[in-house]
Amino acid sequence: MPPIYDLFAMIALGFCAALGMGALVSPKWAAGVVRLVADPDPDKPGGFSEFRATYGGLLLLIHLSALIILLQDGLALPYKVIALFPIAMGWLGAGMGRLLSLVLDRAENRANGLIPVWIPMELILGFAILAPAFGLGASLE
């Protein structure tokens, strides 16, 4: 059984990859999750392509590739952490940006909506993906 730190990362990476798969298969679903309109300007179509590409393919493959790297038994933990670090920082940055928006963009946001839900979710995902790094010191002894 993998260490508990790895399990946290595996669950978070699998969850994020599943979100990406959902967006890839159903861009309407992705539009509802992120509360954006696919084509707000009829003169500039292509919104569904963006949902499939950015929220779908990118999210799916970046998390799936990190999960595959994490599952490599022969690969030393520091190398796995190098693969996980930028993805974790992306989620932590998303949470930080959303927190700033909650504080600074009150008028533009009109209502908090799901912002207070997404902030802890993004922070949890970031720390969960980075969790194997917390066991790094023990593995080097």
Name each model-derived stretch.
Residues D6-V25:
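N-terminal signal-anchor transmembrane alpha helix
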Residues M1-L7, K44-E50, T54, L75-I82, ...:
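Membrane-interfacial loop-to-transmembrane-helix junctions in polytopic alpha-helical membrane proteins
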Residues I129-E141:
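Juxtamembrane boundary at the C-terminal end of a transmembrane helix
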Residues C16-G22, I62, G90-A94, W118:
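Alpha-helical transmembrane segments of multi-pass membrane proteins
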Residues E50, G113-I129:
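Small-residue-rich segments of transmembrane alpha-helices in multi-pass membrane proteins
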Residues I69-R106, R110-P116:
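Transmembrane helix-loop-helix
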Residues S26-F48, S101, D105:
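Cytosolic, membrane-interface loops and tails of multi-pass inner-membrane proteins
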Residues G47-L71, M89-G93:
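Core segments of alpha-helical transmembrane spans in multipass integral membrane proteins
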